[in-house]
Amino acid sequence: MPEPAKSAPAPKKGSKKAVTKTQKKGDKKRRKTRKESYSIYVYKVLKQVHPDTGISSKAMGIMNSFVNDIFERIAGEASRLAHYNKRSTITSREIQTAVRLLLPGELAKHAVSEGTKAVTKYTSSK
């Protein structure tokens, strides 16, 4: 009985090899879509606080989700405050009040002082 022809072994489940396609004459090379994240900023802050410490990609993903979540909460609360006061602009005052409402006690105080410091630095550099 003849043996069936052996084909190339099937790639293992979860294999990470990319399938490359040959380019035709008229095709343009596809660009990788940009994915925005806060990872470079999280990394810069980490190096300021703990210069000898690294961070895994999983931990960076968690930090990115955390920053996005806090941003959305503050923006939403600031928007609500502006709406309540019949204002069409979100100012630093709305942001500050939103931070005071969202963050607990000492954390809110530190966040407000750091935010005020950042705004002062920005306006003085103009």
UniProtKB/Swiss-Prot annotation:
GO CC list: nucleosome; nucleus
Region (Disordered): 1-35
CDD domains: HFD_H2B
GO terms of molecular function: DNA binding; protein heterodimerization activity; structural constituent of chromatin
Covalent S-S links between cysteines: none
UniProt entry tagged with the keyword Nucleus: yes
Classification via SUPFAM superfamilies: Histone-fold (SSF47113)
Superkingdom of this protein's organism: Eukaryota
Bias (Basic residues): 13-34
Description of post-translational modifications: Monoubiquitination of Lys-121 by the BRE1 gives a specific tag for epigenetic transcriptional activation and is also prerequisite for histone H3 'Lys-4' and 'Lys-79' methylation. Phosphorylated on Ser-15 during apoptosis; which facilitates apoptotic chromatin condensation.
Subunit organization: The nucleosome is a histone octamer containing two molecules each of H2A, H2B, H3 and H4 assembled in one H3-H4 heterotetramer and two H2A-H2B heterodimers. The octamer wraps approximately 147 bp of DNA.
Role played: Core component of nucleosome. Nucleosomes wrap and compact DNA into chromatin, limiting DNA accessibility to the cellular machineries which require DNA as a template. Histones thereby play a central role in transcription regulation, DNA repair, DNA replication and chromosomal stability. DNA accessibility is regulated via a complex set of post-translational modifications of histones, also called histone code, and nucleosome remodeling.
Protein name: Histone H2B 8
